[in-house]
Amino acid sequence: MKSGFVSIIGRTNAGKSTLINSLLEEKIALVSHKQNATRRKIKAIVMHEKNQIIFIDTPGLHESGATLNQLLVQSAIKSMGDCDVILFVASVFDSTKDYENFLSLNPQVPHIITLNKVDLTDNATLLKKLSEYAKFSQHFKAIIPYSSKKKSYKKGLLDEIVKYLDEHEYFYDPEFLSASSEKEIYRDFILESIYENLSDELPYSSEVLIHRTKDTPNLLILEANIITDTNSHKGMLIGKEGATLKRIGKDARFKISKLAQKKVLLKLFVTVKKNWQKDEEFLKKLLNDEN
């Protein structure tokens, strides 16, 4: 029996959250085509042949001077020292420059490269990309092609990860899907629905705080505040006669209900907090709040 923690590292939009959901065969991680969508570390628990692997989905590595983005990158880098294995995820279409930047961080634990999205390319392109990474072979333990859409890739990746885990009793109940709180996952589902329903820039000025939950056998009640930085953004989030907010709520309620396996009553409010992305104390509390 082995058990351990695996940090998923990579650039924004490399497909890290989609990979987690595919390994778990359940949606718990926020997925968006927009960059820097992941803000909090999600811990997904995957059981593989009596071994327990806890995957930590981290914010994407990127360069930015914004306070929020700096804290996100710091969170990702910190997770590299708090794990047993690093899974470096890169799209098969990305250059090796991101991997070189990752190596410059001097990772101290074994790492595996996962070339994602291989279902979108041909064998010749994949072989060419594998040869480009070959010059770094002294650094990584393995390089594994992967597709989140095809289950046939799953076993090979999990087998490779288990090789580098220590013998250890389970850290969590093997029936659990995640070590993250349900509230944290629901919050990300709401944020994901904002991303899906609004233009490219507005979602980045928004955050979600769930301030009330009531869970009964047949009904889950949630009340959440969507925080944004200007009155004009508040108006866009609400929409004409509340249409946009209703659409966000409908989408989020569907995702939450599917995971919770019960009816969901979701009440959304929109609050303006100017310059919240520059308030370091607020951001630290926000990013570390799992209650």
Curated annotation (Swiss-Prot):
One of its GO terms (molecular function) is GTP binding. The keyword Nucleotide-binding applies. GTP binds at residues 10-17, 57-61, 116-119. Coiled coil: none annotated. Residues 36-40 are annotated as: G2. NCBIfam families: era, PRK00089.1, small_GTP. This is GTPase Era. It comes from Campylobacter jejuni subsp. jejuni serotype O:2 (strain ATCC 700819 / NCTC 11168).
